[in-house]
């Protein structure tokens, strides 16, 4: 009788462990890094009209500013660099997409487009293979 309980307990513990591992693995989504390559033509207008609402949107969607600024990048090979780069970090691609939604793209096109040209790239983090 004790052996049956021992086997049942072992099977139950194994199943619980498998379920816990699957749950933890499913929650481990990679961070997403968003790189903005921006050629600003009118710095004063960009900083006054465009930047404040964008910074608010980044914060509201869980973004973290990692690096960037005006004239901070150096080209080591390839094409010349833009005059402004920004690197943001989001917890997941879903958070990055929530930030860079239709409303943000429209604002970038209509307001930001008066002052700058943009290229935005999102990259999932992960291990190099």
Predicted regions: what they are:
Residues 1-11:
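Bacterial N-terminal signal peptides that target proteins for export
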Residues 16-97, 124-129:
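Short S/T/G/P-rich N-terminal loop/turn motif that feeds into the first structured element of a domain
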Residues 62-65, 104, 116-120:
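Secondary-structure boundary/capping signal
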Residues 104-110:
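A common structural junction motif
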């Amino acid at each position: 009788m004790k052996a049956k309980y021992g086997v049942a307990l072992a099977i139950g513990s194994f199943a619980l462990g498998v379920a816990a591992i699957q749950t933890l693995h499913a929650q481990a989504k990679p961070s997403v890094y968003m790189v903005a390559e921006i050629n600003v033509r009118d710095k004063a207008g960009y900083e006054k009209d465009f930047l404040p609402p964008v910074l608010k949107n980044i914060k509201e969607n869980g973004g973290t500013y990692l690096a960037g600024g005006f004239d901070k990048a150096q080209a080591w090979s390839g094409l010349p660099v833009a005059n402004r780069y920004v690197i943001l970090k989001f917890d997941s691609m879903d958070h990055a997409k929530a930030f860079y939604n239709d409303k943000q793209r429209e604002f970038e096109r209509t307001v930001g487009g008066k002052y700058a040209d943009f290229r935005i790239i999102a990259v999932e983090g992960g291990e190099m293979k």
